[in-house]
């Protein structure tokens, strides 16, 4: 914690702890012994002679690596080119990590998009080796197909896809290999054109999670449409859940500004709702994905505070039963 809170330094933070093997292309010679180690933060200070620090919040491990030449100059240029995207923050200690929250209330625009999805045949061709003997198990609510070892279903209204495949005698692989192989599967199947990032690994059942992003912010929701779950057995995928619909055309005339609580007021609201900072695992500013009442081809992306407690992500208004839309109306 002392290293994280040291002054005059810059920090890059990942959404979740990332195995070093997945970052190996950034190292000159990363030894295989370190492949399974994970980090959640990269820290470097203003002294050019000091190393770069790689940190794991959960285990409190700190790794050091040699600093690349002219690192600060490159980062200074990046900052100067995007000054308007930054806000002054204050550090807060939560259950799992130190979080940075804005000192003042912040304003972000609500987005409205037209959405599209590939045809069902696109996923059928990708997920089934042989389509000649498929059984059509469809209903009014779902498109559904199966063969002797796998089953696919797609919700007709939302486009949520679920897939299961039975695989026996899979090779036992280290965690970082499962994560890496799952990424290749997602890249092949998902036609999301905006960024998506690794968002966690469940060691108990080999589930790998990814989350979609827009404008640098993660997508959540009461139904978590931003989350992709993939389960690996060896190097093969056995389960998959994700949203086939993707944002396509922004309707800029429907956008509107939403003002969110400052960090201090956010924590005060949670505390008043019965949640102490030591119960809070993570806090993120993100978009709440909801389908428009006009049409399921229209999606509202509303900026909100999202909080992870007991392993579950929910919006602030879900945790405390109130509203967080306008900071001025929050009572703080």
Q: What is each model feature region?
A:
Residues 70-72, 118-119, 216, 262, ...:
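Helix N-terminus capping/helix-initiation residues
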Residues 235-259:
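Short helix-loop boundary/capping segments
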Residues 61, 169-170, 246, 314, ...:
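Short, surface-exposed beta-strand-loop junctions and turns on beta-sheet-rich folds
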Residues 1-174:
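Preferential activation on post-signal-peptide N-terminal prodomains/segments
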Residues 298-332:
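Hydrophobic, glycine-enriched assembly/anchoring segments
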Residues 122-152, 156, 161, 192-236, ...:
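Exposed beta-strand-loop-beta-strand "reactive/processing" segments of non-cytosolic proteins
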Residues 168-205, 216, 251-294:
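Short, non-transmembrane alpha-helical segments in secretory-pathway proteins
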